């Protein structure tokens, strides 16, 4: 039930601002568009459809959950860029979601139709022959029914707890005495398969929940089933993780308690596979504490993860043409992995570009450092990790070899908390010193410092990355990783770790840009430098490649730079609260978004023209949470060859007119047509990595 809220003063909304939540929905629509893109291999389009749904689930859990919590506050809370109230935002989100649901359904039906010529069909019961129906009834009786537990809601059996994102069959039952009851049957079960193949028709499948729904009469023989549907709820995940630092408990125990609380938070959305009468919907809403406006009817399966089973079938039937061409990240030509890496890195900086180049080079460096007698310590910040992490294995080995290993494991990495808790235990048991994050700030930086004892004193090798230390996602996300023996960078990295060990943040830095105290101000200063250059009659230039732009202070400074005549180019994959190309405000700002085979995740900052350029790679987007509420690190790229490489990469992305979409002055995204032959930046980067690796290999063999 919504509380009566006090009104707050409205503000003037700048014409160049876009609401964060609506901008994110536009990003997810671009993901959905790839599912409908005939230029993408058919089986891969299934993946985009599943990613779209997974993204939307998390969006509702986190963002809509937060807004719904705000709606319960005593005072109206307004978003600081467009002045929308929490309620106005939720209303707009719901309408946009309903529109996108229609688009998703049309694309899904198109995909299923296009799969049929390749021998793949997903059907429901009414498309089966009588013989097939009997076969599936036998299958249901033997393989599914024994594992189902029906719940008829009554005084003796209250409405059951429904798990987040699990599928349930719901039915309205009429007893012989004329009483109406509600039945709930869990359909998500690891005991039986979800994707059931029809034995008489190769490549034809049915979802287990559809089979359960069809055979409900067998489970309720003494009742008449008046109506039935499949149901799925999405639960709020907006927990306050800062409270773990207020507890007397061990931080890990406190986080585990919060995770348990999250599983039982109120739903923020209910999805139904069929229409139900108003009375039953009202009853379900009451039991689940969901308002009716959060109920969605969908023609698409409630959980799209089954598409990966269809892909497995297509792979097994040698339908490789329906997939992306298999690609293996190449080893960087900058390092000879058959020789010791530390001496090579002491001579030159290395920039790894994932997934085009292999994270193996960095893992090899850690493994070497774990064994090298000159290495005295390894310090590292960890946010998200792969299952069976080789990086953790290297740190464990280093500790077991007597080296000092200090690891900050961020326990508050959303939806990775349990994994990080387990890794923190493993690292501690091996003798590593583990820090569980920082009170008041999430540690999101990607920083590794290897300290060596030499004849001249301590010597540092520093690695700064834009993405997580995760072998799996390094093959799926575009990221950059700088490995340098620059001693000044190493000293500043050491200061970051010294502060973290004291539960503090770095107050000032020189080469590194370190949030939350330094990064935003330094970025603003560099934008101002470009404004000053234009005022002096020189050219001003800013190039930014990030995932999201929401920081109002930075947005307003970029607008000021545009008004002064600074040329600004931005590659912003997701949320962009700045609307470019508006006369008098942002006409000198160009924004594109790239959604392609790999998830764009790298961050690049470029300031100044050639003779006075400054270039950085960073873990931080230009979001308030990154610049003000997190520990982030941006590192300068000082090597001239690597600067040129960054320039080439950025310019290639700005010229991408196959996967790159232009954000227009209307706030919508449009196709681009720049080249006679469409240019795909990710394809070019892989081709270059492959070519360089081949040339280097041949040269070494000669």
What residues fall within each predicted segment?
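Hydrophobic alpha/beta core scaffold segments
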Residues: 567-571
């Amino acid at each position: 039930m919504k509380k009566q809220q006090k009104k707050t003063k409205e503000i003037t909304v700048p014409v160049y601002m876009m609401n964060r939540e609506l901008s994110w929905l536009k990003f997810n629509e671009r993901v959905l568009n790839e599912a409908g893109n005939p230029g993408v291999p058919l089986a891969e389009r299934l993946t985009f459809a599943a990613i779209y749904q997974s993204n939307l689930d998390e969006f509702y859990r986190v963002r809509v959950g937060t807004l719904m919590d705000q709606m319960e506050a005593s005072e109206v809370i307004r978003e600081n860029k467009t002045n929308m109230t929490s309620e106005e935002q939720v209303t707009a989100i719901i309408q946009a979601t309903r529109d996108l649901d229609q688009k998703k359904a049309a694309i899904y039906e198109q995909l299923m139709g296009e799969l049929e010529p390749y021998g793949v069909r997903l059907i429901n019961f009414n498309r089966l022959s009588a013989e097939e129906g009997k076969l599936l009834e036998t299958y249901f009786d033997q393989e599914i029914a024994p594992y189902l537990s029906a719940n008829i809601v009554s005084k003796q059996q209250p409405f059951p707890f429904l798990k987040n994102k699990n599928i349930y069959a719901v039915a309205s039952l009429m007893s012989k005495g004329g009483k109406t009851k509600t039945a709930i049957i869990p359909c998500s079960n690891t005991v039986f398969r979800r994707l059931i193949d029809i034995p008489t028709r190769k490549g034809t499948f049915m979802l287990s929940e559809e089979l359960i729904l069809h055979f409900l009469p067998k489970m309720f023989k003494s009742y008449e089933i008046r109506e039935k549907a499949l149901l799925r709820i999405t639960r709020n995940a907006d927990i306050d993780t800062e409270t773990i630092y207020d507890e007397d408990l061990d931080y890990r125990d406190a986080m585990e308690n919060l995770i348990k609380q999250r599983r039982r938070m109120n739903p923020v959305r209910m999805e139904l596979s069929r229409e139900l009468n108003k009375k039953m919907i009202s009853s379900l809403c009451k039991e689940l504490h969901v308002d009716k406006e959060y109920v969605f009817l969908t023609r698409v399966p409630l959980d799209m993860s089954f598409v990966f089973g269809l892909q497995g079938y297509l792979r097994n039937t040698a339908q490789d043409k329906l997939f992306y061409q298999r690609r293996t990240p190449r080893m960087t030509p900058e390092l000879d992995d058959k020789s010791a890496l530390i001496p090579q890195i002491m001579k030159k900086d290395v920039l790894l570009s994932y997934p085009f180049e292999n994270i193996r080079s960095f893992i090899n460096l850690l493994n070497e450092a774990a064994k090298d007698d000159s290495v005295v310590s390894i310090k590292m910040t960890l946010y998200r990790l792969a299952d069976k992490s080789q990086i953790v294995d290297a740190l464990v080995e280093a500790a077991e070899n007597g080296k000092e290993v200090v690891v900050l494991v961020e326990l508050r990495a959303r939806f990775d908390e349990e994994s990080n808790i387990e890794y923190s235990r493993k690292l501690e048991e091996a003798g590593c010193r583990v820090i569980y994050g920082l009170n008041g700030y999430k540690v999101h930086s990607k920083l590794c410092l290897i300290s060596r004892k030499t004849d001249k004193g301590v010597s540092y090798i520093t690695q700064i990355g834009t993405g997580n230390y995760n072998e799996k996602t390094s093959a799926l996300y575009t990221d950059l990783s700088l490995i340098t023996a620059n001693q000044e960078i190493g000293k500043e990295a050491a200061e970051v770790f010294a502060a973290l060990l004291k539960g503090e943040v770095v107050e000032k830095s020189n080469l590194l840009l370190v949030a939350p105290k330094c990064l935003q101000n330094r970025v603003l200063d560099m934008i101002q430098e470009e404004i000053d250059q234009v005022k002096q009659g020189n050219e001003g230039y800013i190039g930014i490649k990030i995932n999201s732009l929401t920081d109002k202070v930075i947005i307003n400074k970029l607008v000021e730079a545009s008004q002064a005549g600074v040329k600004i180019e931005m590659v912003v994959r997701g949320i962009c609260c700045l609307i470019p190309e508006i006369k008098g405000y942002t006409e000198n700002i160009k924004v594109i978004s790239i959604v392609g085979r790999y998830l764009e995740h790298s961050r690049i900052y470029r300031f100044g023209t050639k003779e006075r350029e400054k270039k950085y790679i960073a873990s931080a987007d230009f979001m308030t949470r990154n610049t003000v509420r997190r520990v982030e690190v941006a590192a300068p790229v000082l090597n001239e060859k690597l600067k040129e490489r960054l320039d080439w990469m950025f310019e290639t992305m700005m010229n991408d007119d196959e996967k790159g979409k232009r954000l227009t002055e209307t706030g919508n995204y449009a196709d681009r047509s720049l080249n006679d032959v469409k240019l795909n930046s990710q394809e070019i980067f892989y081709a270059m990595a492959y070519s360089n690796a081949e040339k280097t290999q041949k040269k070494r063999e000669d």
